[in-house]
UniProtKB/Swiss-Prot annotation:
Signal peptide span: 1-17
UniProt similarity note: Belongs to the HAPLN family.
Entry keyword annotation includes Signal: yes
GO molecular function: hyaluronic acid binding
Domain Ig-like V-type as annotated: residue spans: 48-164
Link domain ranges (all copies): 166-261, 266-357
Keywords linked to the UniProt accession: Disulfide bond, Extracellular matrix, Hyaluronic acid, Immunoglobulin domain, Repeat, Secreted, Signal
Gene3D superfamilies with a match to the protein in the record: Immunoglobulins, Mannose-Binding Protein A, subunit A
InterPro entries (alphabetical): C-type_lectin-like/link_sf (IPR016186), CTDL_fold (IPR016187), Hyaluronan_bind_Proteoglycan (IPR050691), Ig-like_dom (IPR007110), Ig-like_dom_sf (IPR036179), Ig-like_fold (IPR013783), Ig_sub (IPR003599), Ig_V-set (IPR013106)
Protein name as catalogued: Hyaluronan and proteoglycan link protein 3
Subcellular location: Secreted, Extracellular space, Extracellular matrix
Function description: May function in hyaluronic acid binding.
Amino acid sequence: MSLLFLVLLSPFPCVLGLPFYNGFYYSNDLSGRTLGNGYGEGLFNGVKLVVETTEESLFSHQGASVTLPCHYHYEPALASPRHVRVKWWKLSENGAPEQDVLVVIGQRHRSFGDYQGRVQLRQDKQQEVSLELRDLRLEDSGRYRCEVIDGLEDESGLVELELRGVVFPYQSREGRYQLNFHEAQQACQEQGAMVATFEQLFRAWEEGLDWCNAGWLQDASVQYPIVLPRQPCGGLGLAPGVRSYGQRHHRLHRYDVFCFAAALKGRVYYLENPKKLTLLEAREACQEDGAQISTVGQLFAAWKFRGLDRCDAGWLADGSARYPIVHPRLNCGPPEPGVRTFGFPDPHTRYGVYCYVQH
């Protein structure tokens, strides 16, 4: 396995507690976390309570349903079943608080917050306490703990849920480096996306994302992925990797942002029209076709997961004009696949339009 590099660009020569070399920090610990061995165990009265979950991350997509597996047993096995209390909660990440998901005691159960009406305990087998989660949302991605409580003893296991999606850089209509952290969060939400995590950006870099503009991530750090080192992007002397400026002030500092859009439940399409349209006409045309004008996140997801390939620029909901290319060809932009952009043209300029219809 080749060595992976994380580079911290900092005006300070060193930071206490980090191994530094020539002012740059290298690490192959990409996430700073592990799921352990997939189970927990505890001993009481000579009997061991064991909770088992999966060691592998689960992958799903927005709008889908998923089951987070969790089982428990006793060693040695008990002759008769015991009453247990089960609790599921989502762990804290990137400064967000822990979230209670579901508590079950016998036939009584209670779900919490945004999980109400979307979760239930699955008990198809004896000593199964898996969590069924419906209508997946972007914010459902993360680590969940399954805890089984038997009297004074409790044991737990972790399950990691990831939504399939695509990371894309996003820039304000005012130009480069115009978004503080809160504006970056809003910008991604308006595009049907959320601010990407470092893990999502790193995975996108592994898949070839190369972008020389620094952008906010979910933990309020500012980073950018480089596949081909070059002078304006950290210099030729640095290895490929994700460059980091570290944490930045939520309000005072301004950058672009990396957004994460989940795989689509619906369909994005280029609306065939005998004439080109202004932005207002484009919105109305999608509505007349029983759809709505596509967001940037929806267009990227359609390009990534549905293979949308069209060499015609079209309006999007944010007032930008873009087009998706899966198979690069003459007169359709650079030689690499991607979503091309014309920026934010005058709203009276005429283009096609990309519409989105939900299945």
